[in-house]
Amino acid sequence: MIFIFISFLSLFFKWQRLMFILISLEFIVMSLFILFSGDLNEMMFFYFMCFSVVSSVLGMVVMVGNVKFYGSDLCLF
């Protein structure tokens, strides 16, 4: 439960930067993954795991796509 609280606080206070949004969403998915791992049956667990992997990959694609345009994601690399 502490991961959900920290990730929602991070999402609430640092919503202007794409990197922090992606990190917050990953922490939310990780905490939900830990929370629901014992309650879901095998098929729903597989679906949730695939959904979390696809959302992570799409988030990385969006971040790399934004890094091409310098400064559009408010990050300096």
Swiss-Prot record:
Q: What is its main location?
A: mitochondrion
Membrane topology, from the record: Multi-pass membrane protein
Asked whether the keyword Membrane is assigned, the reply is yes
Q: Which Gene3D superfamilies match?
A: 1.10.287.3510
NAD: is it a keyword of this entry? yes
An annotated GO cellular component: mitochondrial membrane
For molecular function, the Gene Ontology terms on record are:
NADH dehydrogenase (ubiquinone) activity
Alphabetically sorted, this entry's keywords are: Electron transport, Membrane, Mitochondrion, NAD, Respiratory chain, Translocase, Transmembrane, Transmembrane helix, Transport, Ubiquinone
Name the domain of life this protein comes from: Eukaryota
Q: Transmembrane stretches, by residue range?
A: 18-38, 44-64
So what EC number does this one have?
7.1.1.2
The reactions it catalyses are: a ubiquinone + NADH + 5 H(+)(in) = a ubiquinol + NAD(+) + 4 H(+)(out)
Q: Where in the cell is it found?
A: Mitochondrion membrane
Protein role? Core subunit of the mitochondrial membrane respiratory chain NADH dehydrogenase (Complex I) that is believed to belong to the minimal assembly required for catalysis. Complex I functions in the transfer of electrons from NADH to the respiratory chain. The immediate electron acceptor for the enzyme is believed to be ubiquinone.
Q: Which family does it belong to?
A: Belongs to the complex I subunit 4L family.
This chain's protein is named: NADH-ubiquinone oxidoreductase chain 4L
Organism listed in the record: Ascaris suum (Pig roundworm)
Where is the organism placed in the taxonomic lineage, from the top? Eukaryota, Metazoa, Ecdysozoa, Nematoda, Chromadorea
